[in-house]
A protein has these predicted regions:
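Glycine-rich phosphate-binding loop
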Residues: 57-96
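Short, glycine-/small-residue-rich phosphate/pyrophosphate-handling segment
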Residues: 100-148
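Glycine-rich phosphate/diphosphate-binding loop of Rossmann-like nucleotide-binding domains
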Residues: 8-49
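Short glycine/serine/threonine-rich phosphate/pyrophosphate-binding segments
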Residues: 22-26, 50-54, 73-82, 101-105, ...
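Glycine/charged-rich beta-loop-alpha catalytic/anionic-binding loops adjacent to active sites
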Residues: 11-12, 38-40, 89, 112-120
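N-terminal beta-loop-helix "entrance" segment that forms/cooperates
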Residues: 42-63
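Glycine-rich phosphate/pyrophosphate-binding loop and the adjoining helix
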Residues: 139-181
Length: 181
């Protein structure tokens, strides 16, 4: 896949959430995709309130050009697993801490403990930015331009850590560890 030859408005990633109350978390995935100029679509698809819509979304995603689906939900969090059971695309589940949650564990375990044959990649509780990055890494397996951008991003992360190490060393020159940096 070469994104330069693709229709820039055709979404490659679907970002779905069980409720609009999940938007504050799921927006993080959208922000990451925007940072890398990857087109996406964003909508609400409830596994419990709109099961037909959910099945329709999953069933048409690949034909619409979607390559990866990021699905976020709180509470029982069935959305990522049900989407994964209904399509062949990679699904990244984002467990969301909700008001009726058991410290988020219900969401985490609902997404993490999928049965054999129905894989869902799972990120941390409220970890939608990592879901966006994982979607980018999946897309980059067939896009050398995106792969190069991600390599630059990783180098920038290394530079930020190196700057923090230098700052600590400046603050505590006699107490700083001697590990290689």
């Amino acid at each position: 896949m070469n994104t330069k030859n693709m229709d820039a408005t055709k979404p490659l990633v679907g970002i779905i959430m069980g409720s609009d109350s999940d938007l504050s978390v799921m927006k993080q995935a959208a922000d990451v995709l925007q940072q890398f100029s990857i087109p996406f679509e964003l909508t609400v698809v409830s596994a419990h309130r709109t099961p037909q819509r959910m099945m329709e979304y999953a069933g048409t995603a690949a034909a619409r050009g979607i390559k990866v689906i990021i699905a976020g939900a709180g509470g029982a969090a069935h959305l990522p697993g049900m989407i994964a059971s209904s399509c062949i695309l990679p699904v990244i589940g984002v467990p969301i801490l909700s008001s009726n949650s058991i410290d988020g564990w219900d969401s985490v375990l609902s997404i993490l403990q999928m049965p054999s044959g129905v894989p869902v990649a799972t990120v941390a509780l409220n970890g939608a930015s990592n879901a966006g990055l994982l979607a980018l890494q999946i897309l980059a397996t067939s896009d050398t331009s995106l792969s190069a951008k991600l390599a630059i991003h990783k180098k920038e992360l290394q530079s930020k850590v190196a700057d923090k190490i230098k700052g600590l060393k400046d603050l505590y020159p006699n107490d700083f560890d001697q590990a290689p940096h």
